[in-house]
């Protein structure tokens, strides 16, 4: 039977049954054949030199494609397993796969795990295997044959049990692995790889399963790719908020308390407190009423809201109080704010009604997903909900967006994009079941963005279960996209909770609920800022804004303490370093701690009623009158800037008044 193959340009050609991607590619051009590594048939990756199974749309994947790099790294993971099996015959394997920036394989050994010190030996074994350039042979095993092949490996046996029949794999010499993924046709192109690290990972990501050892590596088509990767990893380490948080004593996580439950040290708590006060003041000035609501609620509240049906896997188990009452740690704040709205009969005169809270929430995150402050189990969300009449939606949307842009300006967040997040039309069961609501709300959201003439892109499958949203995607310090802010239209929860207001006509009407987050959770926002600023926070955010150093405690400490008193009275955060250490050591430590201003006082400064000031990152000091320095620092803090000048408010201008 002939194969009808459709190419990306729309042309359809017939090929005999048994044709491979390799044969088709070689028939197109030799230059393409030199770069090709796999195919994609109807969107699924297929091996380069295996027979094409059926007719369909075919793309040739080359070394220039992201999928080509994925195939390279999947092959590297396979060779890693082969090398480990050769070095440690008793080793058991979990799963290995390519990642966005490399590959890994999960392993387990009864006689001691592989350590970081062993990685050079493992890599040499991989390089020796690659040098032999033995053929990678695709194999097909029956379920019985697969059980026999992996009879001594408990984790592979579980994978076989869950797989279909027959089972695909690859063979390299005497090594066979159960492998559904596509690998390179040969090992000759696998020249540039490096093993990187070792970490723990629960089998299949479940904390109830055994902890395996995950060995990480990366691979590229060229040595330059490997060198560039090393530079990126070094840069990532320098920006890593977990490392900076440790060095600047911002936060820590204690395993005796539990993963994903950070402790805020005084320095980190100061940054958080400044941000929280800033946010609250900003929201109150914008018409929000701040509230406090319980972190616990009756489970029925979340059944009514739909969280229990659509979000249960991310919620902690309910607490049975023994008298029929079931309490739940809240995963979101919106049902609580609905209770605030419902506490009184509402009139159209009260709308828009804006409610905000720095609300603590809890999410059932798996241990393997937790990371510093970015992924935690307890978090505090800068949350807000506005209840509006239908004809107020567009103006309120604009008002919220103006507030977000104003906050971004104060934090100097400039690299962001707008994403309209819709439900997945092919997977509607995971969303609230009301097609009319989805059509209307998605249309309103798109209309508001079009009216503002702002560029945006659309993404299906990214909506909340109860409605579409605008996600503002910011670039992290390493160039990755991260959702910072959201605005969501919600027709569902007002319906579920029977929310009403009395209109001008004296009749009851249903409000629209707008969910919005300005900066997300305090935890993730501070992680983001720590990495963007590389720990060198602007003066208004810095835990310690200035450190005062007397040259001689006996002669200059009294003057330094008078300056400190003035600065504290002006609302500044200042410390005195009067330790019995060398001056150079104290100055270097202040720079290491990234304190914005190091202020030195000696005889000359004492006589001139002045101070010598060194800004963080500068190599020189400047003498200033003590009062002038304090006034300039107050102005800098007041205006959220480094130079004390009032900023123009360009972001607000873009969106109008």
Swiss-Prot record:
Q: Which residues form the TGS domain?
A: 1-62
Q: Which UniProt keywords apply?
A: Aminoacyl-tRNA synthetase, ATP-binding, Cytoplasm, Ligase, Metal-binding, Nucleotide-binding, Protein biosynthesis, RNA-binding, tRNA-binding, Zinc
Q: Does the record carry Hydrolase as a key word?
A: no
- Primary location group: cytoplasm
Q: Which cofactor does it need?
A: Zn(2+)
What biological process terms from GO does the record include? threonyl-tRNA aminoacylation
**Amino-acid positions noted as binding Zn(2+) in the UniProt annotation, renumbered to this chain:** 334, 385, 515
Q: Where in the cell is it found?
A: Cytoplasm
Q: What's any one GO cellular component for it? A: cytoplasm
Stated EC number for the protein is 6.1.1.3
Query: So which residues are the signal peptide here?
Result: none
Give me the ranges of the annotated region Catalytic: 240-538
How this chain assembles, per its entry, is: Homodimer.
Q: Which NCBIfam families match?
A: thrS
Q: What does this protein do?
A: Catalyzes the attachment of threonine to tRNA(Thr) in a two-step reaction: L-threonine is first activated by ATP to form Thr-AMP and then transferred to the acceptor end of tRNA(Thr). Also edits incorrectly charged L-seryl-tRNA(Thr).
Q: Per the similarity annotation, which family is this?
A: Belongs to the class-II aminoacyl-tRNA synthetase family.
Query: Protein name, please?
Result: Threonine--tRNA ligase
Question: Lineage in the entry?
Answer: Bacteria, Bacillati, Bacillota, Bacilli, Lactobacillales
């Amino acid at each position: 039977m002939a194969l009808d193959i459709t190419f990306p340009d729309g042309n359809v050609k017939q090929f005999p049954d048994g044709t491979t991607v390799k044969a088709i590619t070689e028939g197109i051009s030799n230059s393409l054949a030199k770069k090709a590594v796999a195919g994609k048939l109807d969107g699924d990756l297929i091996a380069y030199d295996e027979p094409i199974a059926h007719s369909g749309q075919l793309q040739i994947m080359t070394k220039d494609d992201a999928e080509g790099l994925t195939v390279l790294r999947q092959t590297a993971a396979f060779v890693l397993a082969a090398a480990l099996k050769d070095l440690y015959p008793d080793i058991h394997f979990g799963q290995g796969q390519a990642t966005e920036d490399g590959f890994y394989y999960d392993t387990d050994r009864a006689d001691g795990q592989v350590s970081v010190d062993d990685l050079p030996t493992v890599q040499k074994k991989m390089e020796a295997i690659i040098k032999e350039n033995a053929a990678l042979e695709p194999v097909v095993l029956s379920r019985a044959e697969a059980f026999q092949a992996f009879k001594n490996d408990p984790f592979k046996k579980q994978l076989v049990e869950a797989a279909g029949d027959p089972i695909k794999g690859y063979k390299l010499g005497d090594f066979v692995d159960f492998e559904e993924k596509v690998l390179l046709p040969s090992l000759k192109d696998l020249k540039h790889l490096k093993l990187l690290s070792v970490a723990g990972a629960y089998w299949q990501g479940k904390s109830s399963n055994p902890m395996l050892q995950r060995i990480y590596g990366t691979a590229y088509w060229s040595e330059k790719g490997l060198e560039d990767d090393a530079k990126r990893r070094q840069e990532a380490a320098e920006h890593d908020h977990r490392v900076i948080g440790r060095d600047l004593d911002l936060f820590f996580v204690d395993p005796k308390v539990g993963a994903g439950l950070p402790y805020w040290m005084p320095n980190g708590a100061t940054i958080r407190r400044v941000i929280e006060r800033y946010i609250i003041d900003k929201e109150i000035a914008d018409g929000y009423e701040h509230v406090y609501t319980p972190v616990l609620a009756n489970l029925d509240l979340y059944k009514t809201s739909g969280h229990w049906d659509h979000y249960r896997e991310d919620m902690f188990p309910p607490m049975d109080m023994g008298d029929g009452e079931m309490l739940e740690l809240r995963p979101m704040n919106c049902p609580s704010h609905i209770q605030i709205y419902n506490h009184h009969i509402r009139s159209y005169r009260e709308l828009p009604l804006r409610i905000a809270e720095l609300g603590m929430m809890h999410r059932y995150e798996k241990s393997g997903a937790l990371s510093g402050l970015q992924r935690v189990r307890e978090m505090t969300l800068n949350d807000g909900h506005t209840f509006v009449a239908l004809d107020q939606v567009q103006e309120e949307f604009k008002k919220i967006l103006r507030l977000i842009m104003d906050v971004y300006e104060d934090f100097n967040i400039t690299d962001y994009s707008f994403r309209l997040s819709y439900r997945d039309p092919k997977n509607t069961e995971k969303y609230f079941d009301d097609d009319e609501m989805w059509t209307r709300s998605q249309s309103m959201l798109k209309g508001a963005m079009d009216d503002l003439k702002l560029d945006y892109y659309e993404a299906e499958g990214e909506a909340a279960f109860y409605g579409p949203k605008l996600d503002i995607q910011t670039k992290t310090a390493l160039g990755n996209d991260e959702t910072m802010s959201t605005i969501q239209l919600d027709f569902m929860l007002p319906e579920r909770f029977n929310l009403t207001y009395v209109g001008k006509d004296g009749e009851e009407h249903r409000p629209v609920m707008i969910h919005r987050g300005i900066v997300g959770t305090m935890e993730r926002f501070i992680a983001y800022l720590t990495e963007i600023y590389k720990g060198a926070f602007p003066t208004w955010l810095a835990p310690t804004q200035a450190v005062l150093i007397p040259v001689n405690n006996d002669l200059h400490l009294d003057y330094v303490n008078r300056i400190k008193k003035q600065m504290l009275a002006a609302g500044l955060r200042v410390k005195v370093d009067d330790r019995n250490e060398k001056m150079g050591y104290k100055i270097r430590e202040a720079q290491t701690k990234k304190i914005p201003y190091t202020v030195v006082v000696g005889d000359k400064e004492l006589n001139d009623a002045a101070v010598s000031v060194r800004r963080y990152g500068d190599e020189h000091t400047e003498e200033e009158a003590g009062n002038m320095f304090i006034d300039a620092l107050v102005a800098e803090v007041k205006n959220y800037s480094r130079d004390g000048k009032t900023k123009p408010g360009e972001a607000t201008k873009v969106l109008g008044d």
